[in-house]
């Protein structure tokens, strides 16, 4: 079996109600025609998705999107795509969903099309983050940062991207006043969260804000491991769970009870029961919950992949 291509992409481009309805109607048919699985979010501000399938099928769906969308030349309004590979399906189905935002911050005034940080290419990232006058911020959630991040970066310890604005005001602003860094450099998985996070910070007086073009995935694809400042694995939102520096599936798996990533040592813990409980959630669920999780896991185990 040929390897499957995985493509993560987004574009901030205005979509009216008719355009959104057409996409939501057409995308499932395009996916089925091209043997593509995955998830695409559609909102008034654009599209955001990850899909997987045969290389030709993935490219055909992406090309259909390029034709359907009014894309521009700026980074945020192009169809920004990060590609990797998998030996087996990384999604169970295809879904196209209508959302209020393609990445949810919950601040209606934030608009990357009007105000966004300065993009930094992967080849220039090391020099930027090595500069002691740069404050490096990981905009991802705590369960993502727990398994890998850039050396020396600040972890906001958020549980949701919605928490970022409150963290910026409560923690980052006092830190900026105390340390007075010359600039902020931020990063996320594929770049989309930094579009909004940098827009928020620049619009609210946090000074010069830069962000990694194409995110961690782009950096790992372009920078040799021996030169890399990345440590650990990169969490991804599909069945691979995490990628190593070669953009191949790493050593982490997912607890299907609580949804958190598990290291080999986590899985070796005596409390771990696949699909039922892990060290992160052993005290979180009831016996009836665990019985339900066990039944679900048994169904997964019996389903052909």
UniProtKB/Swiss-Prot annotation:
Bilayer-spanning residue ranges: none
UniProt-listed InterPro entries: Rhodanese-like_dom, Rhodanese-like_dom_sf, TrhO, TRHO_N
CDD domains registered for this protein in UniProt: RHOD_YceA
Gene3D superfamilies given in the database record: 3.30.70.100, Rhodanese-like domain (3.40.250.10)
PROSITE patterns per UniProt: RHODANESE_3 (PS50206)
Keyword Lipid metabolism among record annotations: no
The reaction(s) this protein catalyses: uridine(34) in tRNA + AH2 + O2 = 5-hydroxyuridine(34) in tRNA + A + H2O
SUPFAM superfamilies named among the record's database cross-references: Rhodanese/Cell cycle control phosphatase (SSF52821)
Biological process, per Gene Ontology: tRNA modification
GO molecular function, one term: oxidoreductase activity, acting on paired donors, with incorporation or reduction of molecular oxygen
A Pfam family recorded for this sequence: Rhodanese
Ranges for domain Rhodanese: 130-228
Enzyme Commission number(s) of this protein: 1.14.-.-
List of catalytic residues: 188 (cysteine persulfide intermediate)
Entry annotated with the keyword tRNA processing: yes
Broadest EC class assigned to this enzyme: oxidoreductase
NCBIfam families linked to this entry: PRK00142.1-4 (NF001136)
Family indicated by similarity: Belongs to the TrhO family.
PANTHER family: RHODANESE-LIKE DOMAIN-CONTAINING PROTEIN 7-RELATED, THIOSULFATE SULFURTRANSFERASE/RHODANESE-LIKE DOMAIN-CONTAINING PROTEIN 2
Protein name: tRNA uridine(34) hydroxylase
């Amino acid at each position: 079996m040929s390897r499957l291509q995985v493509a993560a992409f987004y574009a901030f481009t205005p979509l009216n109600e008719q355009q959104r309805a057409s996409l939501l109607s057409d995308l499932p048919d395009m996916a089925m025609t091209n043997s593509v699985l995955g998830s695409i979010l559609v909102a008034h501000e654009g599209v955001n998705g990850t899909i997987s399938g045969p290389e030709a099928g993935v490219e055909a769906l992406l090309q259909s999107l390029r034709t359907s969308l009014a894309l521009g030349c700026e980074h945020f309004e192009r169809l920004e795509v990060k590609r990797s590979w998998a030996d087996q399906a990384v999604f169970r189905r295809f879904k196209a969903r209508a959302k209020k935002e393609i990445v949810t911050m919950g601040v209606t005034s934030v608009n990357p099309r009007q105000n966004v940080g300065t993009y930094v290419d992967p080849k220039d990232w090391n020099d930027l983050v090595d500069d002691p006058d740069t404050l490096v911020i990981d905009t991802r959630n705590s369960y993502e940062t727990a398994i890998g991040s850039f050396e020396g970066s600040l972890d906001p310890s958020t549980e949701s991207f919605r928490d970022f604005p409150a963290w910026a005001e409560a923690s980052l602003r006092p830190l900026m006043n105390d340390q007075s860094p010359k600039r902020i450099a931020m990063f996320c998985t594929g770049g989309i969260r930094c579009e909004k996070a940098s827009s928020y910070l620049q619009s609210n007086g946090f000074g010069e804000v830069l962000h990694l073009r194409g995110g961690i995935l782009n950096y790992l694809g372009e920078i040799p491991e021996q030169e890399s400042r990345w440590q650990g694995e990169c969490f991804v939102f599909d069945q691979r769970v995490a990628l190593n520096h070669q953009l191949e599936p790493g050593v982490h798996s997912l607890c299907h009870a609580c949804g958190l990533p598990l290291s080999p040592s986590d899985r070796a813990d005596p409390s771990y029961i696949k699909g039922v409980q892990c060290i992160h959630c052993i005290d979180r669920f009831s016996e009836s919950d665990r019985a339900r999780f066990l039944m679900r896991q048994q169904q997964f185990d019996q389903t052909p992949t």
